[in-house]
Amino acid sequence: ATIHHWVFIRQKMCAWPVYADLGAVSPEQMKAATSALAMLSLSDDPQAQLAAAQSYSMRKIPKSLPVLAPKARYGHSKLRIAYLSSDFCLHPVSMLTAELFELHDRSKFEVYGFCWSPEDGSALRKRVMAAMDQFIRIGALNDAEAAQLIRDHEIDILIDLHGQTRGARPAILAYRPAPVQITYLGLPATTGLPCVD
């Protein structure tokens, strides 16, 4: 973690090259400690970005978690789409997605929001909540409980709006509570998570 923060600070200081040899810590060790988000500004090489994301997921995500989603389709009359985020408040993610939530064709889709966002009382939060057919707070639940709750709602497609950004809860995805899981918007790069389709 210390190396990750050192790389981050050098980026903020515009101290180039970021991966300067420290003697005891090689540039290769620094690259291995770089987050997926930080790698976006350090390299345009897709392989380097994937390696950074996978390194993070290997360090942070529990292994061998039970898969909760069934292999067969649920067969609902409407496809259940759920959005997972801590940014359903006065935040750029909500600014960019509120209309998206509102525009889902309700004759074909049932829209869920699973959140651990702060209750900021903003008009934007109220708009996001109103745009969901079901808005469910999971802030008091641990990752296993949150994943089970998502599974209990028989979500067909789970859309994570974080990726590997601050506030993310990728371990929820690691339980694979939905048959199809994707990420959108929060991190404009790969997550490197094997549980994301």
Predicted segment positions?
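Alpha-helical solenoid repeat scaffolds of the TPR/TPR-like class and their adjacent stem/linker regions
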Residues: A1-D197
